[in-house]
Swiss-Prot record:
Mg(2+) 2 binds at D307, D311. It catalyses: (2E,6E)-farnesyl diphosphate = (1S,8aR)-delta-cadinene + diphosphate. It holds the Pfam family Terpene_synth_C. It comes from the Eukaryota. GO terms for molecular function: (+)-delta-cadinene synthase activity; magnesium ion binding. Residues 1-21 are annotated as: Disordered. Mg(2+) 1 binds at D307, D311. It comes from Gossypium arboreum (Tree cotton). This is (+)-delta-cadinene synthase isozyme C2. Residues 1-16 have a biased composition (Low complexity). It is an enzyme of class 4 (lyase). The Asp-Asp-Xaa-Xaa-Asp/Glu (DDXXD/E) motif is important for the catalytic activity, presumably through binding to Mg(2+). InterPro entries: Isoprenoid_synthase_dom_sf, Terpene_cyclase-like_1_C, Terpene_cyclase_plant_C1, Terpene_synth_N, Terpene_synth_N_sf, Terpene_synthase-like, Terpene_synthase_metal-bd, Terpenoid_cyclase/PrenylTrfase. A motif (DDXXD motif) lies at residues 307-311.
Amino acid sequence: MASQVSQMPSSSPLSSNKDEIRPKADFQPSIWGDFFLNCPDKNIDAGTEKRHQQLKEEVRKMIVAPMANSTQKLAFIDSVQRLGVSYHFTKEIEDELENIYHNNNDAENDLYTTSLRFRLLREHGYNVSCDVFNKFKDEQGNFKSSVTSDVQGLLELYQASYLRVHGEDILDEAISFTTNHLSLAVSSLDHPLSEEVSHALKQSIRRGLPRVEARHYLSVYQDIESHNKALLEFAKIDFNMLQFLHRKELSEICRWWKDLDFQRKLPYARDRVVEGYFWISGVYFEPQYSLGRKMLTKVIAMASIVDDTYDSYATYEELIPYTNAIERWDIKCIDELPEYMKPSYKALLDVYKEMEQLVAEHGRQYRVEYAKNAMIRLAQSYLVEARWTLQNYKPSFEEFKANALPTCGYAMLAITSFVGMGDIVTPETFKWAANDPKIIQASTIICRFMDDVAEHKFKHRREDDCSAIECYMEEYGVSAQEAYDVFNKHVESAWKDVNQEFQKPTEMPTEVLNRSLNLARVMDVLYREGDGYTYVGKAAKGGITSLLIEPIAL
């Protein structure tokens, strides 16, 4: 187990006032009520499943079939990916892209094809040089004015630029250049290109949640005159089949949550189990990860309760035995806790006990020990923040960052996400993850800094809480906006680290790395306009509605 810190001496006396005023939190109740308790009665009928299989084979054949040129091949693969069905054809797509990588045709060198090829190959780990874009610059080093009329090319360059890594100045310039010209052009474009551009300016492919983006692109793709009818029909059926599976999972989780009765027992805590499931379905949506999704949703739900206990209700005196109990991970510790803490402590241990039972048949109990240790470290970091708040202590920015990165919970979620994966995860995977590799560091920075900006900018943090933005402003004598800009630069740098870690050869299989990529994507979607989890913003409501409530008309 992780080393104990709950008895660590503090630098100043701590209050022992039994009547200490508790932190105030006033979270809105769940906007979903009991809506997801029951799964829709209508199952996928046998005829639809048979049609799904027929279309799947048709699409598979089209992926591997020769096409007139690489542009057509790239565009078809891109459509398969953006419609959310590429998980069915992983090997076929990889083989086709490897062939394209080794057989580049310079004759197809327009901006659209160059950018699309660059993006798809980068997405799959190929180290394509950004020098391929130099031919679109003039002698002064600026992008040629002639490319501004090629909206499709600009859009692809814009999307490709989000795959950039450190030192690729031309792609940093491309983001600004394409954003400016696409923003100017969008109002004069015809549908569906206008919708593609408008949506892209709000959400890039690289940083969007695959299922949310697939749901949106389905509505765009069907309006493209040259769309492939078999692919479109397959994607629609596949979306509805996945939606039904996800609804069944969420119904099961909601029943578990309702039985815990935390709304009554812990009224200070956020009731966000539906949003938690949406978060985790962003981490992995594929059918083979059903068990992992359910386990990880329960973990994020309990982590949210633990967070609110530290941050929104418990006194520091109560948090000492609470942290100690989590460190010891023993149900016997429950007798040392205040009455209101007992239900959540028992539920926390029960979630991990169930996890152990579920993975035991495959001899994977060792994975749960890593997951427990990650949760313990999270609780220890929460205790440090609670001590700072009690003492009204303002740490330096670097001191704050060292503790705040673990408190965002992303290292814990990344490690725990591996528990529910198959044989691709090994003991070496957990040893690697426990050593804080760059991609987990990067996704954690994205989470922490986006959360900090959102909480401060949209006033989502209590006045007595220690704020990273306030620490930075005070230490460096800058305005709030200047601090936001610095934090956002850290986020952009972290995204470059994420992209770098996908370039072959990689430390870990892509499926392992995808967990951290998708965790970062969740933050980009939910926290760009405030804390979309706690305050259930437009992105969360829209995503949950489109992915879990509204089926696609066939």
